[in-house]
Amino acid sequence: MEKWWFNLILSNEELEHRCRLSKSMARPRPIGNTNGSQDPSINDRDKNGSDSGNYSFSNLDHLFDVKDNLSFIYDDTFLVRDSNGDSYSIYFDIENLIFEIDNDSFFLSKLESSFSNYLNSGSKNYNRYYDSYMYDTKYSWNNHINSYIDSYLCSEIRIDSYISSGIYNYSENYIYSYVWNGENVSTIKSRSSSIRTSANSSDINLKGRYNDFDINIKYRHLWVQCDNCYGLNYKKIFSSKMNICEQCGYHLKMSSSERIELSIDSGTWDPMNEDMVSTDPIEFHSEEEPYRDRIDSYQIKTGLTEAVQTGIGQLNGMPIAIGVMDFQFMGGSMGSVVGEKITRLIEYATNRSLPVIIVCASGGARMQEGSLSLMQMAKISSALYNYQLNKKLFYVSILTSPTTGGVTASFGMLGDIIIAEPNAYIAFAGKRVIEQTLNKTVPEGSQAAEYSFHKGLFDSIVPRNLLKGALSELLQLHGFFPLNHNSQVKR
């Protein structure tokens, strides 16, 4: 059971609230705004003090605004101090619906009475934040207390996504992604341990909290939410961080253009076959959206003509041929155009004796093109056979999340060196397909890169920020060296 300090301030007109948390329960120190209320009259009243019997509780319900917040702590004691400096211990046990106060006073009796009334009547008093579905059930009472506590936190704490890169071990903090005004990062790091909740006493769902706040919808122009820890990353600098979550290190998806910028030296990228587009070869029938219209919509959305970009460039001065698949374009599905562009890239590299790097990110063959999409597996594999076995050239396959289906069954696993990104989802058939087909449960994490690596499926797991250096060393190991400054790759 954890103990928390709260500082309550009451005024004659309304209930103001402030929050104080501290490592030392005997001597609490503020972590938020320590300058007092912005209202001078409230500051004066707080300094002078007044008889608790004169307090007006006409706006007491403001403290108990009901919102759909995440589950708070199930078994905690809060040390509460009113404006007179009197301290009280408030015990919450949400699971067993227990609310106890250790010191009887006018204020605390009103507070306890409010909670009792809530339990008995469902808190049917008017509340401008009230939702109709919160009237009864244990879930309602849970959220009632959550909002009570959140009202303190939100008054002093500013939502932000980044505390410190060194706080990864505190993923279960209730205030995991908050930054306190007026405190530097080192201070926050040192105090973060004091507000870490016990694993035995809390089960905090970070995803639920962010969904409650509608952060993705309201602030998606500012933040990128991590798929793993559900923390927020500042969008303006996210690309410079290589789309790696600053809070947990998870590798989020990248567009093909971002990967090209990451891997290829500036000013050396020369794309190939950009004008090649699909023409709906089998006239695929769709009740929702015609295939041709769907292609057009993805072209507008992504700025690409197809789900792969191919071309030549330099990697630390070494000329390479590279193809980068883009999952944002119809899930990176492999149709006839994708297969043709990759095949032409390999044939070009064969004629010029260039190393080939293909970055895979695909859901598999494109169903809208039927057997033509399946034939791309054989076509690309045939081109690689000539490239690798006959010409003895070097091919590196990079598997990113997700790499599944026909890509996994063909060129994705044919590299001389196969590299995967951390936590990448790599499989032939997806979890749901396997479970429905075999009627067996697929163990969690069995299709992650780390699991497959230990089974020998590929050669190495390389973090994104180290990838370019690793590729450079591999190329030099296989006899490829940087060009002279005056040399250029000619097509």
UniProtKB/Swiss-Prot annotation:
Among the entry's GO cellular component annotations, what is one? chloroplast stroma
Q: State where the C4-type zinc fingers lie.
A: 226-248
Give residue spans, biased composition: Polar residues: 32-41
Subcellular location per the Swiss-Prot or TrEMBL entry? Plastid, Chloroplast stroma
Q: Which domain of life is it from?
A: Eukaryota
Q: Which residues form the CoA carboxyltransferase N-terminal domain?
A: 222-491
Q: Name one GO molecular function term.
A: ATP binding
Matches recorded under InterPro entries: AcCoA_carboxyl_beta, Acetyl_CoA_COase_Trfase_b_su, ClpP/crotonase-like_dom_sf, COA_CT_N
Q: What cofactor is needed?
A: Zn(2+)
The Gene Ontology biological process terms listed for this entry are:
fatty acid biosynthetic process; malonyl-CoA biosynthetic process
- Give the EC number(s) under which this enzyme is classified: 2.1.3.15
Cofactor remark: Binds 1 zinc ion per subunit.
Q: Which reaction does it catalyse?
A: N(6)-carboxybiotinyl-L-lysyl-[protein] + acetyl-CoA = N(6)-biotinyl-L-lysyl-[protein] + malonyl-CoA
List of residues binding Zn(2+): 226, 229, 245, 248
- The UniProt entry lists the main location of this chain as plastid
For this UniProt record, the keywords arranged alphabetically read as follows: ATP-binding, Chloroplast, Fatty acid biosynthesis, Fatty acid metabolism, Lipid biosynthesis, Lipid metabolism, Metal-binding, Nucleotide-binding, Plastid, Transferase, Zinc, Zinc-finger
Per its UniProt entry, what is the enzyme's top EC class, as one word? transferase
Q: Where is the region Disordered?
A: 26-49
| Pathway membership | Lipid metabolism; malonyl-CoA biosynthesis; malonyl-CoA from acetyl-CoA: step 1/1
Q: Which family does it belong to?
A: Belongs to the AccD/PCCB family.
What is the annotated quaternary arrangement, including any partners?
Acetyl-CoA carboxylase is a heterohexamer composed of biotin carboxyl carrier protein, biotin carboxylase and 2 subunits each of ACCase subunit alpha and ACCase plastid-coded subunit beta (accD).
Q: What does this protein do?
A: Component of the acetyl coenzyme A carboxylase (ACC) complex. Biotin carboxylase (BC) catalyzes the carboxylation of biotin on its carrier protein (BCCP) and then the CO(2) group is transferred by the transcarboxylase to acetyl-CoA to form malonyl-CoA.
Alphabetical list of NCBIfam families matching this protein = accD
Question: What protein does this entry describe?
Answer: Acetyl-coenzyme A carboxylase carboxyl transferase subunit beta, chloroplastic
Organism, per UniProt? Answer: Ceratophyllum demersum (Rigid hornwort)
Lineage of the organism: Eukaryota, Viridiplantae, Streptophyta, Embryophyta, Tracheophyta
Name the gene for this chain. Answer: accD
